[in-house]
């Protein structure tokens, strides 16, 4: 017997501890806690190696789960035609189509959702932070700090906006790049109207840009459409509607948008 199998030899000769199963169960139950503890407390190279190991484990686990799911799915047609004749009472039954029906239902639902929330510009170019912000140095000559940023793109601020004190203002939005109105085109009516902007709903670049009210190509803004006289099915006047910016406001000097209907 090879020298490295002494543990197996001992087990064959003397058997296991009487509480072996209980100890194994408890050890397996503690593994989750130990993994969590290591993930939080390890630092440096050991942490990197540990995270790499965990990543590979998770990838393998996901592959295994996917394989199990594919194995359990009932296919729409049998892999090979059956050679045995079916009895009379089974002839009217179709082959199992659970997976096919479920798949088509999910696809239809996704298509409806996509149509409901479709926008004129589904993809936009990413904007780097260097392009979005200009570093502003502040402080005395001997100790200049570079923690302030000036936004180089057009922005929207509400009517009740007040600047923070200069010492605490991290992001500067220049007055010359603040916009209050947008040229909104109604796609069905084919008219373009200048409407006041109410708020910035979503900037596709970054959630922080949404908070700052940055207006870039592809941004979703809410505009006041009360001038258009749109009404709901119940007869109420529509006040605010969403629109997507279709031009580059920093180049054109104006905000052009298409109403989402």
UniProtKB/Swiss-Prot annotation:
One Pfam family it belongs to: Ribosomal_S8e
Function description: Involved in the biogenesis of the 60S ribosomal subunit. May play a part in the quality control of pre-60S particles.
One CC-aspect GO term: nucleolus
Family listed: Belongs to the eukaryotic ribosomal protein eS8 family. Ribosome biogenesis protein NSA2 subfamily.
Main location class: nucleus
Gene coding for it: nsa2
Keyword NAD: no
GO biological process, one term: maturation of 5.8S rRNA from tricistronic rRNA transcript (SSU-rRNA, 5.8S rRNA, LSU-rRNA)
Location(s) in or outside the cell: Nucleus, Nucleolus
Motif Nuclear localization signal: positions: 10-17
Basic residues bias: start-end ranges: 51-65
Protein name: Ribosome biogenesis protein nsa2
């Amino acid at each position: 017997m090879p020298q490295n199998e002494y543990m197996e030899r001992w087990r064959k000769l003397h058997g296991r501890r009487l509480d072996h199963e209980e100890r194994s169960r408890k050890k397996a139950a503690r593994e989750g806690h130990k993994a969590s503890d290591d993930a939080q407390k390890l630092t440096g190279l050991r942490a990197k190696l540990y995270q790499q190991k965990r990543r590979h484990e998770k990838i393998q686990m996901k592959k295994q789960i996917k394989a199990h799911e594919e194995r359990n799915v009932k296919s729409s047609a049998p892999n090979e035609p059956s050679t045995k004749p079916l009895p009379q009472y089974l002839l009217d039954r179709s082959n199992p189509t659970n997976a096919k029906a479920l798949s088509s239902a999910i696809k239809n639902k996704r298509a409806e959702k996509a149509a409901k929330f479709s926008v004129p510009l589904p993809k936009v170019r990413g904007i780097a932070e260097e392009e979005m912000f200009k570093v502003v140095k502040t402080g005395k000559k001997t100790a200049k700090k570079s923690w302030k940023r000036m936004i180089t793109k057009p922005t929207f601020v509400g009517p009740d906006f007040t600047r923070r004190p200069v010492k605490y203002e991290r992001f500067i939005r220049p007055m010359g790049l603040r916009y209050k109105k947008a040229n909104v085109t109604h796609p069905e009516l084919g008219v373009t109207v200048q409407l006041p902007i109410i708020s910035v709903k979503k900037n596709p670049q970054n959630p922080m840009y949404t908070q700052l009210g940055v207006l870039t190509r592809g941004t979703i803004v809410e505009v006041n459409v009360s001038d258009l006289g749109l009404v709901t099915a119940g007869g109420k006047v529509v006040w605010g509607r969403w629109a997507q910016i279709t031009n580059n406001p920093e180049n054109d000097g104006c905000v052009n948008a298409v109403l989402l209907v």
